[in-house]
Amino acid sequence: MSKVCIIAWVHGRVQGVGFRYTTQHEAQRLGLTGYARNLDDGSVEVVACGESEQVDKLMKWLKDGGPRSARVDRVLSEPHRPGEELTGFRIRY
């Protein structure tokens, strides 16, 4: 299996609904490193690194709508090379 990193931007009703916390829980369950943080435009940025199959599972979870309290309208993503070593999956502010 190969290691990959992606950066994704999740748009919709994704702030103020526990989206970052449930994303963190799901990413940790999948053994991924990275972070989730709110952006000023109302979206959430997610960086996820790990085995490609596990990253794909997180992306599917995001595209399927994430937590029940959220409404995901669109998820954009691209390969990413973090400028720092990521340990654990964190919520950034």
From Swiss-Prot:
User: Its catalytic activity?
Assistant: an acyl phosphate + H2O = a carboxylate + phosphate + H(+)
Class in the EC hierarchy, top level: hydrolase
Q: What is its EC number?
A: 3.6.1.7
Going by the entry's taxonomy, the superkingdom of the source organism is recorded as Bacteria
Q: Acylphosphatase-like domain spans which residues? A: 5-93
One Pfam family it belongs to: Acylphosphatase
Active site at which residues? 20, 38
The UniProt keywords, alphabetically, are:
Hydrolase
User: What PROSITE patterns does its record include?
Assistant: ACYLPHOSPHATASE_1, ACYLPHOSPHATASE_2, ACYLPHOSPHATASE_3
Residues that span the membrane, as ranges: none
What stretch or stretches form a coiled coil here?
Answer: none
Q: Name one GO molecular function term.
A: acylphosphatase activity
InterPro entries documented for this protein: Acylphosphatase, Acylphosphatase-like_dom, Acylphosphatase-like_dom_sf, Acylphosphatase_bac, Acylphosphatase_CS
Family according to the record: Belongs to the acylphosphatase family.
This protein is called what?
Acylphosphatase
* Lineage of producing organism: Bacteria, Pseudomonadati, Pseudomonadota, Gammaproteobacteria, Enterobacterales
